[in-house]
Amino acid sequence: MAGSTGGPLIAPSILAADFARLADEAAAVNGADWLHVDVMDGHFVPNLTIGLPVVESLLAVTDIPMDCHLMIDNPDRWAPPYAEAGAYNVTFHAEATDNPVGVARDIRAAGAKAGISVKPGTPLEPYLDILPHFDTLLVMSVEPGFGGQRFIPEVLSKVRAVRKMVDAGELTILVEIDGGINDDTIEQAAEAGVDCFVAGSAVYGADDPAAAVAALRRQAGAASLHLSL
């Protein structure tokens, strides 16, 4: 899956940004493919971050497509409003609902792409049959809830399984990864078949976030190209 620049998609995570300067922090990653927003409710995960009002404010100050990752209970109720607000992609957790296909349908009806995410310890097999109802699969490579964690390479087996289905023409879906992505880990994720890479500290911890986005994109692109040769 190519981004707007012809390479892999890079989605800086504002969880690692300065929350007092979110408009400036969004501008600092101009050229990114998506802007990743982690919404946490303090219930599904132990941390509490931001919600719909902040997302609406961000949408008013940036043209970067908004990638909303909802780490919340009851996505059946809360996911569609993010799509209605103008988010490009709205992802919720498989573990948070008994009706993932219905939630995906409501997100799409509200005008956004629908994504489903699984925690590192959640098997993907029970959800393979419903993936055609989704536009994005977000594989968590850390335990959701906090940024700055160490990458869990074992989750790449999930990526490889879905990439095999995509390459065989059995499925059309974008594979995204979130957690511990940096210049030490992005190549192995790209080689496994990831399309979109969420990066927090690796971008916002850099002196030049936009340059960090470009560098990560180059690394992922080179690894993906090597895989296809």
From Swiss-Prot:
Cellular compartments per GO CC: cytosol
Q: Which reaction does it catalyse?
A: D-ribulose 5-phosphate = D-xylulose 5-phosphate
Positions of the catalytic residues: D38 (proton acceptor), D178 (proton donor)
Residues that bind a divalent metal cation: H36, D38, H69, D178
Q: Which InterPro entries match?
A: Aldolase_TIM (IPR013785), Ribul_P_3_epim (IPR026019), Ribul_P_3_epim-like (IPR000056), RibuloseP-bd_barrel (IPR011060)
Q: Which UniProt keywords apply?
A: Carbohydrate metabolism, Isomerase, Metal-binding
Cofactor binding remark: Binds 1 divalent metal cation per subunit.
Molecular functions per Gene Ontology: D-ribulose-phosphate 3-epimerase activity; metal ion binding
- GO BP terms: carbohydrate metabolic process; pentose catabolic process; pentose-phosphate shunt, non-oxidative branch
Question: What EC designation does it have?
Answer: 5.1.3.1
Q: In which pathway does it act?
A: Carbohydrate degradation
Q: Name one Pfam family in it.
A: Ribul_P_3_epim
The record's top EC class is isomerase
Role this protein plays: Catalyzes the reversible epimerization of D-ribulose 5-phosphate to D-xylulose 5-phosphate.
Which protein are we looking at? Ribulose-phosphate 3-epimerase
Organism equals Mycobacterium tuberculosis (strain ATCC 25618 / H37Rv)
Name the gene for this chain: rpe
